[in-house]
């Protein structure tokens, strides 16, 4: 299996596009199916057994909420 290059990308989306992605994610979760998403030109497949967490950060006057999805790629 070809090794994928490391990357760390943050991509902004308009509200309507973000909502559509969340809806597709919720639909996949409810059906216990994998979730496919394209981020900055790369298609990502999130397995149905991924781990979902919500993180909250506060520093100074800034706050951040991150919805995180983590998994280990098979065959590594």
PLM region descriptions:
Residues 1-25:
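Terminal, regulation- and interaction-focused segments at domain boundaries
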Residues 2-8, 34-38, 42-76:
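N-terminal intrinsically disordered, cationic/polar leader segments
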């Amino acid at each position: 299996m070809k090794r994928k290059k490391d990357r760390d990308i943050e991509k902004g989306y308009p509200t309507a596009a973000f909502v559509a992605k969340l809806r597709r994610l919720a639909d996949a979760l409810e059906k216990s199916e994998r979730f496919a998403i394209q981020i900055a030109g790369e298609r990502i497949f999130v397995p149905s057994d991924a781990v979902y967490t919500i993180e909250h950060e506060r520093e100074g006057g800034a706050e951040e909420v991150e919805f995180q999805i983590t998994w280990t790629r098979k065959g590594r």
